[in-house]
């Protein structure tokens, strides 16, 4: 299974099953322990999503891509799976906020507190028009967090929303800016 997959945390043994899915590790490899102590319970109407980055990523064979985790970022993508027809659809809602948690050793909790809404044009679609399911992301600026395999990324979203993510790696080549 691809490393860059979303993870929905479930209590009990589901946490460990979810970690196995997301980490994509070989069975003999170590699995990082998910420690959510110090995080408050999600507010009513919110659902908790957790990403536990793996510290055992394969090195890139591309010499132009940095192999150092300090040069990596994780993009958080909030969205919803919707049915698409001939109309243009967009997801609307508040942006993500970050709250530092001193009781959790300075870790952060990311939240989208209000519900997401699908806005759409209202054209009459042809009955022959195919309908498909697709993921709509919240139309905001990309939200990046530093890559740290020691700490989980904890995000509380409105029920019905989904969290996806992808890993970004910097180039090794640093370019000089123009001085004016």
Swiss-Prot record:
Keywords noted in UniProt: Signal
Annotated signal peptide: 1-30
Domain of life: Bacteria
Disulfide bonds: none
Entry GO MF terms: serine-type endopeptidase inhibitor activity
InterPro entries: Ecotin_sf, Prot_inh_ecotin
Keyword flag Signal: yes
Pfam families named in the record: Ecotin
Family: Belongs to the protease inhibitor I11 (ecotin) family.
Name of this chain's protein: Putative ecotin-like protein
Organism: Synechococcus sp. (strain WH7805)
């Amino acid at each position: 299974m691809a490393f860059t997959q979303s993870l929905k945390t479930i209590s009990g043994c589901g946490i460990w099953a979810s970690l196995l899915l997301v980490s994509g590790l070989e069975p003999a490899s170590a699995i990082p322990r998910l420690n959510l102590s110090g995080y408050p319970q999600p507010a009513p109407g919110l659902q908790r999503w957790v990403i536990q980055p793996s510290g055992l990523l394969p090195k890139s064979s591309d010499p132009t891509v940095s192999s150092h985790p300090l040069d990596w970022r994780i993009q958080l993508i909030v969205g919803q799976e919707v049915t698409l027809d001939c109309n243009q659809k967009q997801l609307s809602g508040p942006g993500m906020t970050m709250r530092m948690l001193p009781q959790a050793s300075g870790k952060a909790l990311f939240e989208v507190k209000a519900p997401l809404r699908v806005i759409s044009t209202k054209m009459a679609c042809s009955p022959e028009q195919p309908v498909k399911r697709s993921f709509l992301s919240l139309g905001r600026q990309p939200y990046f967090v530093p890559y740290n395999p020691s700490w989980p990324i904890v995000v509380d979203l409105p029920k019905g929303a989904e969290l996806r993510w992808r890993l970004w790696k910097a180039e090794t080549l640093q370019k000089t800016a123009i001085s004016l």
